[in-house]
Structure formats: C-alpha cells, structure tokens
Amino acid sequence: MSRKQLALFEPTLVVQALKEAVKKLNPQAQWRNPVMFIVWIGSLLTTCISIAMASGVMPGNALFSAAISGWLWVTVLFANFAEALAEGRSKAQANSLKGVKKTAFARKLREPKYGAAADKVPADQLRKGDIVLVEAGDIIPCDGEVIEGGASVDESAITGESAPVIRESGGDFASVTGGTRILSDWLVIECSVNPGETFLDRMIAMVEGAQRRKTPNEIALTILLIALTIVFLLATATLWPFSAWGGNAVSVTVLVALLVCLIPTTIGGLLSAIGVAGMSRMLGANVIATSGRAVEAAGDVDVLLLDKTGTITLGNRQASEFIPAQGVEEKALADAAQLASLADETPEGRSIVILAKQRFNLRERDVQSLHATFVPFTAQSRMSGINIDNRMIRKGSVDAIRRHVEANGGHFPADVDQKVDQVARQGATPLVVVEGSRVLGVIALKDIVKGGIKERFAQLRKMGIKTVMITGDNRLTAAAIAAEAGVDDFLAEATPEAKLALIRQYQAEGRLVAMTGDGTNDAPALAQADVAVAMNSGTQAAKEAGNMVDLDSNPTKLIEVVHIGKQMLMTRGSLTTFSIANDVAKYFAIIPAAFAATYPQLNALNIMRLHSPDSAILSAVIFNALIIVFLIPLALKGVSYKPLTASAMLRRNLWIYGLGGLLVPFIGIKVIDLLLTICGLV
C-alpha cells in the first residue's frame, strides 16, 4: 500500500522552500554546486557594478546592469528553490514517520523469559542486548528479535498497510520494528540496536536526505559541467581584450550575462533536485533506499534474480488434476485425496477438496462427523493425512511417500514414477496419495503464473535486462515454469550458497545484479548483490544486508524499483541534453548583441531579429532563469518512462530533449524580447 502522495506544489511546502532558497544564498551552501557558484559570483559582481554606476563611480547604464544583476540573483534563487522543494517533499514524508516515534517507557526484563521481574525504563535508554516485554496495546520500543511468544502486530505506521501481521519466535517472522503496536498477546524481545540506530531512525535520516551523498554518475556529470564551465569562463575572459582591441570594449555586465547563459545552469540548478526526488519517488513506492547510490544502481541493473513464488507465480499452488495409478479409478483417488485434505487449511489442501467436489461432487464431509483423526504435516514426515476407521490415508512428496510405502512393506509402482516425472515436466508439483501401503496416484499441484508477467519480462528483455527465476523446485518443474513465464534463465533447487555463487558469476562478467530476500539465509546474497531489496517482514539480518527495504514486503516490487532507478537516470540525461542544447540557441541571441558593434559581420547570426542588443541580452538572461522553474515539475516527477532498447531510448530523448532544447529558447527569448519591447522596458 503506497503512502498518500504530496501535491507537486503543496502551498506549505512552496512557502518553506522559498524561505530555504533565500537561506541557501550563503557562499558555503553555494560552493557545493560549482556551476551555480559561478552564477552567484556573477550576481555579486554585477550588483557591485550596478551600485558603482548608480553612484557615478563607473560609467554605464545602471538600470540595465541592475536588471541583469536582479535576474542573475533570481536564477540562483530558482536553483535553490528547486533543491529546497525536493528536500521539503522528502522532509514532509519523514515527518509522517517522526509521528511514529513516541517517547515511551519500556518494561526491561531482568531475565530473558516471560514472567521475570521487570524495570520500567525510558525507551530511548534501551541498549543492544536488552530484553523487554511488550503486551497488547503496547508500542514496541526498539528494533529486535522475538525470543519468546507470538502476537498480532499493527505495522501500519511503518508500512502503510492496515492488515496486522503475526510476529513470533523462531523462523523468518521473528523480526520486529520499533514504533509498531501489539494488538494481541505478548512478546519477549531482544533489542538488536542501540538508540538512534533503529530502522525508524535510519528511515527518517535517509528520507530527510541528511545522509544523501552524490552518486558516482552524479559526480561524473558534475565534473563534466565544471569542465564546460571552465571552458566557457576562459572563452568569455578572452572576449574582452578582443572587443577592446576592436575599439568597442564589451562591458563586464554583458560578459557576465554571456557566461551565465552559456554555462549549463539549467542542469546545474536541477541536478541536486533530481537526486533527492529519485529517493522520494522510491519512498512513494513504499521502498526505503539507504542511499542515492542504491537508486542509481537500480537504473543500471542488467540482471534480475526473481523468486518464483509470489513474484512469477501467484504463490498458492492449486490442484489441477487427479492422475490415478494403474488399476485405480480416478474417483477413488479423488475420494482419498479429499479425505486426506479435509482438515488441511493450506491453500493447496483447500484446492484439493474443491477439485474433488467439482469433478465428482464429493461434498459435505468433515473430520468430526466422520470420527476421523487428522494427521498434520511435519518437517520430519513431510506428509499429512487422516486415519478413518481402518483406513490410513496419507499425501505428501514423492520421497516421503516412497519411504512410507517401503516402511509398511509395500512397493512403489514404476508407473507412478513415470506419472510423477510427467507432472514435473509440465511445470506442476507432484503430490502422491497412498492408502496403507498401496499407492493410489498423483495430484498435480500447478503454480499459476501471474497474468501479464510474460509481457513484462519481454519488456525487460528489450531494455537489455536478463531475468533469472530462483526456485527450490527440481529442474524439470523449474524448466517448465520458466518456459511458461518467459524468463531468460532459472536456478533450480536453489540454496543460499548457489544464489551467492550465481551473483558472483554475473558480477565477474561485469553485470549489475538485483535481487530480493527476506530470510537470514538470504543475507549473504543480499550483501553481495548490487541492488538488494529486503522485505520488511523479513529478518533483521536480511534488512541490514540489503540496501533497500520494501515496506510492503512484495517481491514483485523489484521490477518497479528498477523502473524508478532507470527513470531517475533518464531524467538526469534528458535534462542534461536539454540544457546543453539550450546553450546553442542562447549563443545566437547574445553573441550578435554583444559584439555586433565591434564586428558588424556578426549581425548575420541575429536570426531571431531581436529589438536591440540590450533587449537581446536581458531576454536571454530572463529565459535562462525562468526555464529552471518550468523544468522543476519534470525534475521532481521524472520524465515519462517507456521500456525501450538503449538505442531507441537515445533516439527518442535526442528528438524530444535535444531538438526541444534547441527550439524552446528561440521561441522563449523572442517572446520575452517582444514583451519587453511592448512594455517599453528596453
């Protein structure tokens, strides 16, 4: 369940962002963005020149210089506003999480067992290793592992999902999160973190962006922008002596305006906002990323390791067919299978009862009325069934039933072995039914592949992403399901060691690997993967090993995570293309205006036929500032994303953002020039 989405320009956020934009005018804040720092210096320089002209210290048009100076300050403010708005949206999301943190008291047990003496201590004083007792109505005071008890827990404050979940000692459901509430029963919990290190604390810090660091691609792009800025700075600096030598020196104000319009201020002003917004969009999908690096890596992923159950298939195997052994009627097999499943509350057991009812109208029977005894499934026996009168009926895996038959002096029929093999080849799981020592036949339990999943894998393949299905099934079953689902490869009979080895193999080939996991046994593979999405319902070890946590605990979310990562990279690339294309158009506006008096031949470049040199320069500076504001929604929401091949995506972006970046400035600058002329401002 996703959290409530904030409006793009929430009034309270806009007001706060405007205040923050002004605060960010200090040199220390500006220095972090080298491109905008150059604009900030230019604004300061032109302001000083305007004051000097107004006071008569320097000759020149003080009004024009002041107008240029004002719009340069506006450019810096707009860039600050874009970053502050993105950060404000993240902080607003974090505030909803802060509401979960409550200063409360905890019952710290003196011994690690229920009923032991307890001391009442502030929750924020609990340390790693402390044992606490929580009962119905209590807020869990710390992250930890359940060591005794079982309870229903409301995790909606963290996940946004209203349905309660069961947390109990042992297994993969022992992990609890501080800030969640016990609805029933009790738990004895061992705290796994120190104050300030809880999952909730880390979520708040990550969402607020306090720990946001520039990603490798962001650093590389920043270096490129700095290089372009230095090139244009040197080029602009050499223009003054050239113009002076020509007998009509260009003013410093015009040179500063030229520099600001030529350097990539658009992407420079939006780069931080794009990174912050990427993490914010991930949170909108109920996924917490530990860093911007994790989001960026998601965009570069080219191998997806996907668990079969819950991701590729619906997760609940359904009985699809009764296949009797030689000499056994199908109805007799269905009758025995239904009897063995009457008290089996698993989805598989319920589906067997329903199939027998549909095929042979076997209904209105229950264990109690039949005076029968239900035999539950255990990890040791790997069978379940029923004892009724003198009949002993069992259903279970092939190996378990084979051992059972041989232990009772029977013989496992060869024709049933063939039927088991046939079921496995069709992608179903064989379940064998036996009465006493006589094998009655096989039930085919079919994994239902999710609708539309094959098409999604085809889209991923177009994007150059390889999909690998991970399953504990045997190779025959795995191969059949893989073919039906349309994945590129599969790992059958998967063990934690096999998953880890597979990830390392792909990484050795230079690929980036993404996977999901929820158990402690998944932790080594999660730690190795480039993008590791841990389920919030999983163990503490899994969550610590991953670099993302899915609050919905939905394995399918991995595909959405990759889409969000790719959208962030596309947004950054598209706006960079647009920004650089902008510079070309602004060149045709400013160069003729600035140097036509010295070099009349440059008038040939004045293809926009702007009103005057002053209006041309001012129009370009105004456009340079306004375009940042107009692109803020695109930076925050991301460009529209379609699963395409890399070459098709490049062509599409060059047409839209390259050509658009050339045309929009020509139109925008011309319109602004006309408005300035009509209003008599130039």
From Swiss-Prot:
At the top level, the lineage of the source is Bacteria
Chain residues that bind Mg(2+) = 518, 522
**Main subcellular location of this protein, as a coarse class:** membrane
Instruction: Please give the InterPro entries that the UniProt record associates with this protein.
Output: ATPase_P-typ_cyto_dom_N, ATPase_P-typ_P_site, ATPase_P-typ_TM_dom_sf, ATPase_P-typ_transduc_dom_A_sf, HAD-like_sf, HAD_sf, P-type_ATPase_bsu_IA, P_typ_ATPase
What EC number is given for this enzyme? 7.2.2.6
| Reactions it catalyzes | K(+)(out) + ATP + H2O = K(+)(in) + ADP + phosphate + H(+)
Keywords, sorted A to Z: ATP-binding, Cell inner membrane, Cell membrane, Ion transport, Magnesium, Membrane, Metal-binding, Nucleotide-binding, Phosphoprotein, Potassium, Potassium transport, Translocase, Transmembrane, Transmembrane helix, Transport
Under Gene Ontology molecular function, one entry of this record is: ATP binding
List cellular component terms (GO).
plasma membrane
Give the location in the cell: Cell inner membrane
Where does this protein hold ATP? 344, 348, 377-384, 395
Transmembrane region positions? 34-54, 62-82, 219-239, 254-274, 588-608, 616-636, 662-682
Active site annotation, chain numbering = 307 (4-aspartylphosphate intermediate)
Keyword Ligase (UniProt): no
Function noted in UniProt: Part of the high-affinity ATP-driven potassium transport (or Kdp) system, which catalyzes the hydrolysis of ATP coupled with the electrogenic transport of potassium into the cytoplasm. This subunit is responsible for energy coupling to the transport system and for the release of the potassium ions to the cytoplasm.
> What protein family is recorded?
Belongs to the cation transport ATPase (P-type) (TC 3.A.3) family. Type IA subfamily.
Q: Tell me which NCBIfam families the record gives.
A: ATPase_P-type, kdpB
Q: How does it assemble?
A: The system is composed of three essential subunits: KdpA, KdpB and KdpC.
Q: What is this protein called?
A: Potassium-transporting ATPase ATP-binding subunit
Q: Name the source organism.
A: Escherichia coli O81 (strain ED1a)
Record lineage: Bacteria, Pseudomonadati, Pseudomonadota, Gammaproteobacteria, Enterobacterales
